[in-house]
Amino acid sequence: IFAEDEFPPNSGIYIRDLGPDVLLRSVAIAYRGAKSVVASPKVRKTPGSFSQSVRVGDWLLLAGQDAVGFNRQVEAEGDLAGQTEVTLQHTMDILEEAGGTLDDIVKTTVYLVAGQDRSKFAAAYRKFFNRYSRSSRMPAGLTVEVRELSPRCLVEIDAVAYLGD
């Protein structure tokens, strides 16, 4: 149904309690116009069935990024602030490949492993945006606590960006 390099962006997250008798919850965004896959050579291509990002019109939908590098090792292992910075750098690299900047992000969804100090994440997140963003505007966001992510990863972030005028 999808060409090998044209899978939709995706974040694979385990959430323990979706509700009574709920086994799966899925959200899909459909678009009938032209779509293009955008991938940065600076970011590791994850084996599997999703793209780093997909551009639909002026919108860029970015798959969840984490702190795993090209060597398949987690960068800043055990350090939530460090992993947040690496994860946001991956996100920014993909945005730049699409011609965007951090200022174009309108929403992020953050997945934090349970038991992490959210204030450390929030401080690293704000610091990164303050350093690389031209505006003081932060994107809308949602933070979800999860039981686990990729092995040794403490944070994963997916994003939606608007690249229009």
Q: Where are each of the predicted segments found?
A:
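N-terminal presequence-like segments and the immediate start of the first folded domain
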Residues: 1-89, 93-107, 112-165
